[in-house]
């Protein structure tokens, strides 16, 4: 029997909803998808609840209409500069007199790693496990093996309760749905755009959104870092509006139709016309001026990323290179600027074969990744046997942030 599941991304520029059907063998088909402009967000966080909620509700309704079905719960993306990550570690001595590892030994090490108290007003969103060590050697599953000590770590991300509550409230109270899980936008998009082989080789995925840029870095197949940079495509629009003295709608049009990450020789002689109105009239702008403004902000963004990651930007550890996705990755030449600033090979991420070409666009990486994340082995795969919905992690989170 197939199972219907949903995904929602409350993005800075658009709210997106997706409906998927999971078959008994675990395959996923996208049966409905819709998006609506979202004027209730700024830098990945809700600033006008009603506008954000209306955009989500409209996109969900349209996606359900397209699919011919309804959803009861959704996977919800979470981003924003309020999110913070750190590596938490724990260890446990093997309790058996024979030094044979048991499941309880592993549980004790995990509890120690997760024991750290978060600050008041904050809650953990993700605990993402990194390699397990048995007597200092990495192992996939130590249970049943012989050794003396288990060490493990989690990349743990916490967030501001108020920001989390707002996002949950849009789904649970306004849309009347359950949240199956809250997933970092960076993890969702990297799950979609960087397959297991790339993650094992080591890769950095940079998701260039409208309000923020999400980062996820993998080493040896495991998450080693996630982060959110408060710079996105809207900043380019704002820069063009101020620098060229045009209204933001015109600036957005200039960015999309004529923008480049860096100017080239041909731009010096090319002129772009803005068809104005009775107030401003028509105007001509050198294309080089557009590229110059964009270039400054793009360089600044990648310089911030370079400073943020520091020693983590190690070519020997990131043999899979750096991938760009998100709507901002469509900017011509952006991979070349990124490579020059970061000092590593950078390319635009490509979707795996089999994704509907109409859906396989960079700006859809996160919402598609929400469902594909659940299909991978992250403790509770989508379409698994009909277990009772897990109240554990998410139930505790909802309780802590005041959602019943």
Each language-model region and where it sits:
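Hydrophobic alpha-helical bundle architecture
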Residues: 307-327, 341, 347-353
């Amino acid at each position: 029997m197939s199972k219907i599941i949903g995904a929602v991304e409350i993005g800075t520029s658009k709210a997106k909803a997706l409906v998927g059907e999971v078959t008994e063998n675990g395959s996923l088909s996208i049966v409905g998808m819709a998006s609506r402009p979202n004027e209730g967000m700024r830098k990945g966080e809700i600033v006008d609840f009603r506008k954000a909620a209306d955009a989500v509700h409209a996109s969900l309704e349209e996606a359900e209409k397209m699919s011919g079905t309804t959803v009861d719960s959704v996977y919800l993306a979470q981003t924003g500069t309020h999110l913070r990550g750190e590596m938490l570690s724990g260890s446990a001595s093997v309790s058996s007199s024979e030094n044979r590892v048991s499941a309880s030994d592993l549980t004790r090490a995990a509890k120690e790693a997760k024991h750290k108290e978060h600050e008041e007003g904050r809650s953990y969103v993700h605990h993402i496990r990194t390699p397990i060590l048995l007597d200092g050697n990495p192992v996939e599953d130590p249970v049943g093996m012989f050794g003396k000590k288990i060490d493990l770590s989690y990349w743990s991300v916490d967030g501001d309760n108020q920001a989390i509550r707002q996002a949950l409230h849009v789904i649970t109270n306004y849309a009347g749905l359950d949240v199956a899980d809250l997933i970092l936008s960076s993890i969702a998009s990297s799950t979609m755009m960087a397959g297991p082989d790339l993650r094992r080789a080591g890769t950095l995925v940079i998701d260039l959104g409208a309000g923020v840029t999400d980062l996820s870095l993998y080493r040896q197949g495991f998450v080693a870092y996630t982060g959110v940079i408060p710079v996105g495509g809207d900043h380019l629009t704002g820069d063009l509006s101020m620098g060229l003295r045009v209204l933001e709608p015109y600036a957005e049009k200039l960015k999309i139709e004529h923008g480049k990450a860096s100017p080239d020789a041909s731009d010096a002689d090319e002129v772009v016309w803005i068809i104005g109105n009775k107030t401003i009239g028509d105007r001509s702008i050198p294309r080089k001026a557009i590229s110059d403004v964009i270039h400054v902000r793009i360089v600044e963004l990648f310089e911030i990323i370079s400073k943020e990651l520091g020693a983590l930007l190690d070519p020997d550890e990131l043999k899979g290179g750096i991938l760009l996705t998100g709507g901002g990755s469509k900017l011509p030449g952006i991979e070349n600027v990124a490579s020059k600033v970061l000092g590593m090979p950078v390319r635009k991420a490509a979707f795996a074969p089999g994704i509907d070409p109409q859906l396989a666009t960079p700006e859809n990486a996160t919402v598609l990744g929400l469902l594909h994340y659940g299909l991978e082995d992250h403790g509770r795969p989508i379409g698994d046997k009909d277990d009772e919905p897990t109240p554990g992690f998410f139930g505790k989170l909802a309780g802590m942030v005041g959602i019943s």
